Amino acid sequence: MQILVVDDETDVCTLFQQRFRKELRAQKLNFAFASSGKEALHYLHSHTTEAITVLSDINMPGMSGLELLRHIREEFETSPPDVIMITAYGDTENYNQALSLGASDFLTKPLNFNLLRQKLQLES
């Protein structure tokens, strides 16, 4: 399974690699990381033959996660990736906006990694 994590915080990469060490070792998961929405779109356009799940932070400088989601839904209409939005703000406005733009799911920080494993359909 290919996962693209989009977050402007550099320590997120290390956190995901630590929390999913078992799955990475068993080659059940492969992570790619993008530090901006623009970088994420470039990655998605260059990996169109792969099934990718995107985990994107909402609050990022430049292109927000919601703007990224809008671009993904417009640019990948025929085979859009699943997009799970992640935010430190658990308000209903972000939740409703993400779902109305086509998000597959929504998680709040700090992340519950067992819940994320369930959403990614991985064993706990």
Task: Tell what function each PLM region has.
Residues 67, 79-80, 90-105:
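Alpha4 helix (beta4-alpha4-beta5 surface) of REC/receiver domains from two-component response regulators
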Residues 48-55:
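Active-site beta3 strand of CheY-like receiver
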Residues 60:
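Receiver (REC) domain active-site loop signature in two-component systems and cognate sites
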Residues 93, 111-120:
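C-terminal output helix
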